[in-house]
Amino acid sequence: IQSTSMDQGSLTEDSMNSFIRTLIQAGIWKNKVPKQTARTKDGMQTTVKRTKAEAEAVASEGTRLGFQPVVLVDAELLRQQRRFSSPRVLLSENTPLEPPPLYLMEEPAVLNRTSRRKRYAEGKSHRGEYSVCDSESRWVTDKSSAVDIRGHQVTVLGEIRMGPS
């Protein structure tokens, strides 16, 4: 699989998850070959472990050649996944003609990551603050009645008793 940088649409989480699931099933996720499966009498799939001899043969072959086995990707798998367009990765059957451009080095805004502008809200927010008393610029301590936010006359309690009476 070759990857190149592209600026195409964005991926939804569901489409990316199904694509990763397809890669895992195809055995190309993290260069792993899928485990062999067998069906039991009741139709359930079970994983068949490799014998010790098979595991040693695969391990010695990899060390003898000096590299991990390469998993071939079927072109049909790539054709099925064309709908997964990512702004960063493109699955392609062809080798890229040139290295990907370095977008981050060209953008001057990214070079100075410490300079950030603060967002300021316009005006002072008074959400959740309601006045029970008449509007005055000083504390009112001698009032026995007031007008609430709905315009009703209410009695101001001078003392609030809490606990058992």
Swiss-Prot record:
One example of a Gene Ontology biological process annotation: modulation of chemical synaptic transmission
SMART domains in UniProt: NGF (SM00140)
Keyword Metal-binding on entry: no
Alphabetized GO MF terms: growth factor activity; nerve growth factor receptor binding
Top-rank taxon: Eukaryota
Compartments, as annotated in UniProt: Secreted
Positions of glycan attachment: 112
Xref: Pfam families: NGF, NTF3_N
UniProt KW keywords: Cleavage on pair of basic residues, Glycoprotein, Growth factor, Secreted, Signal
InterPro entries: Cystine-knot_cytokine, Nerve_growth_factor-like, Nerve_growth_factor-rel, NTF3_N
Propeptide boundaries: 4-119
Keyword hit for Signal: yes
Disulfide bonds: none
GO cellular component, one term: dendrite
Signal peptide: 1-3
Main subcellular location of this protein, as a coarse class: secreted
PANTHER family for this protein: NERVE GROWTH FACTOR NGF -RELATED (PTHR11589), NEUROTROPHIN-3 (PTHR11589:SF4)
Family (UniProt): Belongs to the NGF-beta family.
Its job: Seems to promote the survival of visceral and proprioceptive sensory neurons.
Entry protein name: Neurotrophin-3
Protein source organism: Calabaria reinhardtii (Calabar boa)
